[in-house]
Amino acid sequence: MKIELLTTPADAAEVRIEEQIRPARMEDFTGQQRLTDNLKVFISAARMREEALDHVLLSGPPGLGKTTLAHIIAAEMGSSIRATSGPLLDKAGNLAGLLTGLKRGDVLFIDEIHRMPPAVEEYLYSAMEDFRIDIMIDSGPSARAVQLKIEPFTLVGATTRSGLLTSPLRARFGINSRFDYYSPDLLEGIVMRASGILSIGIDQDAASEIAGRSRGTPRIANRLLRRARDFAQVEKAAVISRRIAMKTLECLDIDEEGLDDMDKKIMDTIVNRFSGGPVGVASLAVSVGEEQDTIEEVYEPYLIQAGYLSRTPRGRVATRQALLRFSDGSVSRHTGGLFDADGNLS
C-alpha cells in the first residue's frame, strides 16, 4: 500500500513513533467491534465485486483511531491512500489536483472534513456521486466549464464534529461510522501492545494505571506510555513499574479520572467564576486562554462524558457532580439553592 501524506507533519520523531504503534491491518485494530465487523463485510463485498468501496464517514472525538482506520481501509482494499485535511483544501483547484491524480480504487482521506470551505465541499458532490468534476477554462466572457471523468475512488472523511457537515455532503457517504470512547480494559491491552513495539517492559499494574487515566482515548494512552518510558529510561529501569507510572502521571498533573490542568481550569472557571453557568463558549475560551475550537473539540467531549459538563441552548453548565468537586463555596447565592449558607451542597 502506498501512502502519500499531504498534511504538514509534526515532529519527525513523534511521527515515526506513531507509525510504529499504529495497527496496519484490521485484525490488529483494537476496539470499536461493531464498526470494524461491519467494515470487514463492506470491504469483502467490494473486493468480490471488484469495485471501489463506498464512501466512508468516520466521526467521533479526537484520538480514537479514525486516521488509523482510514489507512487500514486502504490496506485491506489493496489500494493507495492520499491523505490531506479540510483546512488545507482552501481552493477547489487543490481538490481537483488530488482527484485527477487518483487511480482506480484509491482512497482519498480528508481529516477534519467539516472544516472544508463550502465552495470546495460543493466541488466534491459530483466527484463522489458520478466520478466527474467540472473545470473552468479561461476567464471572463470566454470562460467555459469542461467536464472531466475521474477514476472510481473511495473518499474517507474524518470529523470530530459531524453536526457541522452539511446535509448534502453527509448524504453522499454510503457508510457512516461513529467511534465511541474505549473501556479501561481495552486501553490496557493497547498500552501492553505498544510497550512491546517500543521495546520497553511494563507491569500490568502500571499499564492499568495509565489506561485508567487516558480519557478513554488510545492516542492519550500511547502518549502517556511514551512519557512513562522517558521516566523509566532516565531512572535506568528496564520496566515501567506502577511507581514510575504514578510518578509520570503526577508530574503531568493528570488525576485519577484523566483530567489534566486545562480540564480543571475549565471546570473551575465555569463553577466559581461563572457561578456554575450557563456561560458561552467564547467567553469561556477567553477566560481560560484557550482556542474556542480546542475547547469544543478536545476538552468538552470528555468533560461531558465524565458527567461534569452540560451543553444547553444558553451555554455551558456545570453539573451537580462538578459543583461537588470543583466549588470553592463562593457560588452559593447564584446556584438556585444548591448550596447552603456554609457553601456546602444542600
From Swiss-Prot:
<feature type="binding site">
    <location>
        <position position="182"/>
    </location>
    <ligand>
        <name>ATP</name>
    </ligand>
</feature>
<dbReference type="Pfam" id="PF17864">
    <property type="entry name" value="AAA_lid_4"/>
</dbReference>
<feature type="binding site">
    <location>
        <position position="316"/>
    </location>
    <ligand>
        <name>DNA</name>
    </ligand>
</feature>
<keyword id="KW-0378">Hydrolase</keyword>
<dbReference type="InterPro" id="IPR008823">
    <property type="entry name" value="RuvB_C"/>
</dbReference>
<keyword id="KW-0547">Nucleotide-binding</keyword>
<feature type="binding site">
    <location>
        <position position="67"/>
    </location>
    <ligand>
        <name>ATP</name>
    </ligand>
</feature>
<comment type="similarity">
    <text>Belongs to the RuvB family.</text>
</comment>
<keyword id="KW-0233">DNA recombination</keyword>
<feature type="binding site">
    <location>
        <begin position="129"/>
        <end position="131"/>
    </location>
    <ligand>
        <name>ATP</name>
    </ligand>
</feature>
<dbReference type="InterPro" id="IPR036390">
    <property type="entry name" value="WH_DNA-bd_sf"/>
</dbReference>
<comment type="function">
    <text>The RuvA-RuvB-RuvC complex processes Holliday junction (HJ) DNA during genetic recombination and DNA repair, while the RuvA-RuvB complex plays an important role in the rescue of blocked DNA replication forks via replication fork reversal (RFR). RuvA specifically binds to HJ cruciform DNA, conferring on it an open structure. The RuvB hexamer acts as an ATP-dependent pump, pulling dsDNA into and through the RuvAB complex. RuvB forms 2 homohexamers on either side of HJ DNA bound by 1 or 2 RuvA tetramers; 4 subunits per hexamer contact DNA at a time.</text>
</comment>
<protein>
    <recommendedName>
        <fullName>Holliday junction branch migration complex subunit RuvB</fullName>
        <ecNumber>3.6.4.-</ecNumber>
    </recommendedName>
</protein>
<dbReference type="InterPro" id="IPR003593">
    <property type="entry name" value="AAA+_ATPase"/>
</dbReference>
<feature type="binding site">
    <location>
        <position position="22"/>
    </location>
    <ligand>
        <name>ATP</name>
    </ligand>
</feature>
<feature type="binding site">
    <location>
        <position position="172"/>
    </location>
    <ligand>
        <name>ATP</name>
    </ligand>
</feature>
<feature type="region of interest" description="Small ATPAse domain (RuvB-S)">
    <location>
        <begin position="183"/>
        <end position="253"/>
    </location>
</feature>
<dbReference type="Pfam" id="PF05491">
    <property type="entry name" value="RuvB_C"/>
</dbReference>
<dbReference type="GO" id="GO:0048476">
    <property type="term" value="C:Holliday junction resolvase complex"/>
</dbReference>
<dbReference type="InterPro" id="IPR041445">
    <property type="entry name" value="AAA_lid_4"/>
</dbReference>
<feature type="region of interest" description="Large ATPase domain (RuvB-L)">
    <location>
        <begin position="1"/>
        <end position="182"/>
    </location>
</feature>
<feature type="binding site">
    <location>
        <position position="68"/>
    </location>
    <ligand>
        <name>ATP</name>
    </ligand>
</feature>
<dbReference type="GO" id="GO:0005524">
    <property type="term" value="F:ATP binding"/>
</dbReference>
<dbReference type="GO" id="GO:0016887">
    <property type="term" value="F:ATP hydrolysis activity"/>
</dbReference>
<feature type="binding site">
    <location>
        <position position="21"/>
    </location>
    <ligand>
        <name>ATP</name>
    </ligand>
</feature>
<keyword id="KW-0238">DNA-binding</keyword>
<comment type="subunit">
    <text>Homohexamer. Forms an RuvA(8)-RuvB(12)-Holliday junction (HJ) complex. HJ DNA is sandwiched between 2 RuvA tetramers; dsDNA enters through RuvA and exits via RuvB. An RuvB hexamer assembles on each DNA strand where it exits the tetramer. Each RuvB hexamer is contacted by two RuvA subunits (via domain III) on 2 adjacent RuvB subunits; this complex drives branch migration. In the full resolvosome a probable DNA-RuvA(4)-RuvB(12)-RuvC(2) complex forms which resolves the HJ.</text>
</comment>
<dbReference type="Pfam" id="PF05496">
    <property type="entry name" value="RuvB_N"/>
</dbReference>
<dbReference type="GO" id="GO:0006310">
    <property type="term" value="P:DNA recombination"/>
</dbReference>
<dbReference type="InterPro" id="IPR008824">
    <property type="entry name" value="RuvB-like_N"/>
</dbReference>
<dbReference type="GO" id="GO:0005737">
    <property type="term" value="C:cytoplasm"/>
</dbReference>
<keyword id="KW-0067">ATP-binding</keyword>
<dbReference type="InterPro" id="IPR027417">
    <property type="entry name" value="P-loop_NTPase"/>
</dbReference>
<feature type="binding site">
    <location>
        <position position="311"/>
    </location>
    <ligand>
        <name>DNA</name>
    </ligand>
</feature>
<dbReference type="GO" id="GO:0000400">
    <property type="term" value="F:four-way junction DNA binding"/>
</dbReference>
<dbReference type="GO" id="GO:0006281">
    <property type="term" value="P:DNA repair"/>
</dbReference>
<dbReference type="InterPro" id="IPR004605">
    <property type="entry name" value="DNA_helicase_Holl-junc_RuvB"/>
</dbReference>
<feature type="region of interest" description="Head domain (RuvB-H)">
    <location>
        <begin position="256"/>
        <end position="346"/>
    </location>
</feature>
<keyword id="KW-0234">DNA repair</keyword>
<feature type="binding site">
    <location>
        <position position="66"/>
    </location>
    <ligand>
        <name>ATP</name>
    </ligand>
</feature>
<feature type="binding site">
    <location>
        <position position="63"/>
    </location>
    <ligand>
        <name>ATP</name>
    </ligand>
</feature>
<dbReference type="InterPro" id="IPR036388">
    <property type="entry name" value="WH-like_DNA-bd_sf"/>
</dbReference>
